[in-house]
Amino acid sequence: MTRIKSAVAAGGRRAPHSARLGSASTRTIGAVLAALLMTHDAGAAEPIIGQASVIDGDTIEIAGERVQLNSVDAPEEWQVCLDERGADYRCGKESASALDAFLSASRPTRCEFAGRDRYGRFVGTCFRADGKDVNRWLIESGNAVDRDTDNKGLYASAQQTAKSNGAGIWRAQPEHACAARVGRVNRKPSC
């Protein structure tokens, strides 16, 4: 106690006890937070496996977690497309129904983590129990398009197959879901 008083009396300043501990405490807290963040990221990278419920043509839910199918853009549920005769059909509803039937044929579904989208949803590539790539199938069957801005054309060959076969939305000239969303909600395109 005398030394502290004499240091202050001599014009020196000594940090309070709490401040001296603060730097060690701050380092400890920082290390704990860093460990938690690394654990969280490692946990987020784990695949999700379970029975999938179809939300729409490019979104499913497994065990309460919404999964946006990576590099897939399907028509919105409300979206109407033109068929080969120029007649309207509910392509968004058709896409979601086709996805549900495809997933139901081989359960459970496993989704590999690719990241999170701007809404915080799990973004992944999903596979049926028999190993078939759900994302690729959606595009190859013409029920969705390759969002090539995300994957540098990973599914370009699948999309070309769908176009060549006139499958799904490729029966006529489709309006891409992204463009339809922009027109409906009056926002900037994300594609």
Curated annotation (Swiss-Prot):
Signal peptide: none annotated. SMART domains: SNc (SM00318). This is Succinoglycan biosynthesis protein ExoI. Keywords: Exopolysaccharide synthesis, Plasmid. Residues 1-21 are annotated as: Disordered. It comes from the Bacteria. Pathway: Glycan metabolism; exopolysaccharide biosynthesis. One of its GO terms (biological process) is polysaccharide biosynthetic process. Pfam families: SNase (PF00565). The gene is exoI.
